[in-house]
Every structure is written in structure tokens, then in C-alpha cells.
Amino acid sequence: MLARRRFLQFSGAAVASSLALPLLARAAGKTAASAPTDAALTAATDFAALEKAVRGRFGVTLLDTASGRRIGHRQDERFPMCSTFKSVLAATVLSQAERQPALLDTRVPVRDADLLSHAPVTRRHAGKDMTVRDLCRATIITSDNTAANLLFGVVGGPPAVTAFLRSIGDAVSRTDRLEPELNSFAKGDPRDTTTPAAMAATLQRVVLGEVLQLASRQQLADWLIDNETGDACLRAGLGKLWRVRDKTGSNGEDARNDIAVLWPVAGGAPWVLTAYLQAGAISYEQRATVLAQVGRIADRLIG
């Protein structure tokens, strides 16, 4: 409760730019001693300083689901979703399955022509078929791109996912193309983008809200907690006080993202953390280190 009170006090106040802390040393693994209140006072400026240190563009939202308050950096700017869209794609499938009970067990052919370069699960099933349920699991847990495209075919294409987003109150996020084209991004092009704030609200709705039935929410949460691609990202910076359900995304060029629902092990309301990074001046592995640092900043504030 102390951490949540600190967060509420901080998120309702403006933070002057003079409070910014240099984050370059911290990103390399060093820490600075600070009182609990210091963590609250410096979180937003820490995010901005981290962005400056990596010479990129960085958006983050930390949402307290108990109060609706949030803090972050560039929360309302558009970023390419990359594979973080797959959480919403799976939610779209689950929503349709609530009206079509046999959908998750429907078998979908996996053709050689369907296979993309990142197809760790579907490649093993080429020439055979997979259930929609197994395709969802593959695209969330291993970020299998072929599975994602096959699921687009199941639900009605990218426009159907955007329609689902609009139906649950997300007027910002959108899916327009298939893998791998959806990963390309140019400034001013809204295709296949979201904002940190919009995705935080959407993740809250589909995992914690009532837009999906309880069984569907539990299924989505189970897939997210089994995710195999996020250990070096937000999870790496969050302490053992949290059970993390997340979905990562990257484009292999400059973007690396991670979105997560954080459940306190000790109980209490969850938090949602979304982080979108564009930093072409650093390596793929270094981008993961930046996301881990975001986890540390969040953990310092709410842990």
C-alpha cells in the first residue's frame, strides 16, 4: 500500500525537468542509493533520461489498475506495435470463440508457402494442420509469425482485429498488414501502430476487464505467462515480488517492445507496464537491456 500511495502522490503532480537523473551508468548495471520517495519523484524523468542515453525514442506507460492513474514518457505518441499486436490478435480469436464454441478446435492447414523466416512451431507442422488454439499458443509463446498470419485468416484479417479494438474502446491501436510487412514503420504512418497509453488500457481490458469472459481471460493470461521471448526484457528488471505476463515485439532494425501485466505475489491489484523503444544506434541485445532497466525503474517505484 505504501508503494501505491507513493505512486498516487507522484502521478498527480508535475515533475520539473531539473529533477532528471543521468541513467547511462544505471543502464550499464550500476545502481544509486535513494530513499523510497526519491523513486517516485524521479521515475518519469528516469524514463526520459534513459531515452537520451540510448539516442532513440522511447515510450512507456505504467498504469495502476486500482486507481486508473498512470505515469510514463511519450505515452500518447505512436510506435510500431511489432509482435505486441499478437496479444490483441489472440484476444480477438478468443472473443470470436465465445460466439463460435468450436473455433479453438478448428484445424487450419499449414502450407510450405505459408512459412516465414520466424516459424519455430509452425515449421514443424508444414504440410499438416494445427488447431486455432495451438496457433494462438505458438504466436504468443514463441512469437511465431506464420501462426499470426494464419490466425489473421481465421478472424477476418487485420481489419477484424482493428474492429475488435474499436469495440472494446481502443480508438488508437490498429492492425493493417500481415507479417512481416507490419513491422515496417515510417514517421507519420499510423499503420500497425499504437501508443503506450492505448496499449496499456487495452491490455487491462482484455486480461483484467470484462470484454472477454472469465475462461477467455484466464486462457490469454496463461499464454502470456508462458511467453518464452521476454526473459531478457521487462521480466529481467522486475523483482521476485511480481508474476509477469508479457508479450514482446521487435522488427530486427531499431524497435524492441514489451507489454506486461504485473501481479503482486503478495496479492492486491495488478499493474500494467507497456514499453516501446526505437533505438537504431544500439544492438538488439542492448535494446533488451533498456527494457530491463524500465522494469527496474517500475519495480523501484511500485515494488
UniProtKB/Swiss-Prot annotation:
Its EC number is 3.5.2.6. Gene3D superfamilies: DD-peptidase/beta-lactamase superfamily. Predicted to be exported by the Tat system. The position of the signal peptide cleavage has not been experimentally proven. It catalyses: a beta-lactam + H2O = a substituted beta-amino acid. The keyword tRNA-binding does not apply. It is an enzyme of class 3 (hydrolase). Keywords: Antibiotic resistance, Hydrolase, Signal. One of its GO terms (molecular function) is beta-lactamase activity. InterPro entries: Beta-lactam/transpept-like, Beta-lactam_cat, Beta-lactam_class-A, Beta-lactam_class-A_AS, Beta-lactam_L2, TAT_signal. GO terms for biological process: beta-lactam antibiotic catabolic process; response to antibiotic. The class A beta-lactamase family has a specific amino-acid numbering system, sometimes called Ambler or ABL numbering and often misspelt as Amber. A multiple sequence alignment was used to derive a consensus sequence and then the consensus was numbered taking into account insertions and deletions. This allows use of identical numbers, e.g. for active site residues, despite differences in protein length. UniProt always uses natural numbering of residues, hence there appear to be differences in numbering between this entry and some papers. Belongs to the class-A beta-lactamase family. This is Beta-lactamase L2. It comes from Stenotrophomonas maltophilia (Pseudomonas maltophilia). The lineage of its organism: Bacteria, Pseudomonadati, Pseudomonadota, Gammaproteobacteria, Lysobacterales.
